[in-house]
């Protein structure tokens, strides 16, 4: 009996380990995104590189969310629309991270397309 209780307690304690937040690598703040977007119009090619890197990261992040959730919320959505949405989101939320924007955009796209979360 006590072995069974110990086993159940171990399972319950271990489940808390899996409930922890995941650290995201490469996520930038919205304030940094706005700054990079301003530099994107520069005549110096090197000034445009950070925005290109962040765009690639964000599209990868969204694609990863779509794959992980098995919800094809990106279907029919073009990159320009995604970046316009992100520009508006980041102007309104400069202290948030792009990962938070990705979560909100995914939720909004699923709602618009009638996809259950």
Regions from the PLM with identified roles:
Residues 1-2, 23:
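N-terminal Sec-dependent export signals
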Residues 20-88:
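Short N-proximal segments of mature Sec-exported proteins
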Residues 94-117:
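C-terminal partner/receptor-binding element of secreted or periplasmic proteins
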Residues 14-16:
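N-terminal signal peptide c-region/cleavage motif recognized by signal peptidases
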Residues 2-10:
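Sec-dependent signal peptide recognition
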């Amino acid at each position: 009996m006590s072995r069974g209780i110990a086993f159940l307690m171990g399972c319950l304690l271990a489940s808390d380990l899996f409930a922890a937040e995941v650290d995201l690598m490469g996520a930038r703040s919205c304030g940094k995104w706005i700054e990079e977007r301003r530099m994107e119009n520069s005549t110096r090619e090197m000034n445009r590189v950070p925005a290109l890197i962040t765009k690639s990261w964000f599209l990868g992040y969204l694609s990863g969310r779509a794959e992980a959730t098995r919800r094809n919320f990106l279907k029919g959505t073009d990159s320009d629309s995604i970046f316009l949405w992100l520009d508006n989101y980041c102007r309104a939320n400069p202290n948030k991270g792009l990962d938070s924007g990705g979560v909100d955009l995914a939720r909004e796209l699923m709602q618009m397309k009638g996809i259950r979360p």
